[in-house]
Amino acid sequence: MFCGVDEAGKGAVLGPLVVAAVACHTPGDLDGIPVKDSKALRPAERARLSDLITTRLRSAVLVIDSGDIDAFRRNSSMNLLVARAHARVIAELRPHRAYVDACDVIASRYGRTVAACLDFPCRVTAEHHADENRPVVSAASIVAK
């Protein structure tokens, strides 16, 4: 099993941080679901697709409110907060492989940070624009929004 992970929102101005993971057993699991980057979808279409994705596939969602984000950022970085959140939703699904949208200018470093937060073996691949290039991450992006 593999999963894709993405997030939406990042702090007091934007509201809560919502992190979502969507799991697939094969790439064909997404057949019939027109996933693309959630920013390109109208809200009604995004809601319809989110319902379809979460009905057909295993998913995990974590919501971190803006107060908790602000408190964490007093002593640590936003990248670490998001990496830990990515790891939490990955851990709920326990895939062998996870694709995450990189939140660091060095994508490979971000992938290592997420992997270090996991307590089970999982190959984590972090990529910039993964929400545009990997359908499973696009699906997670739709669910997160």
Label every PLM stretch briefly:
Residues 1-3, 7-145:
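Acidic (Asp/Glu) carboxylate-rich active-site/surface patches
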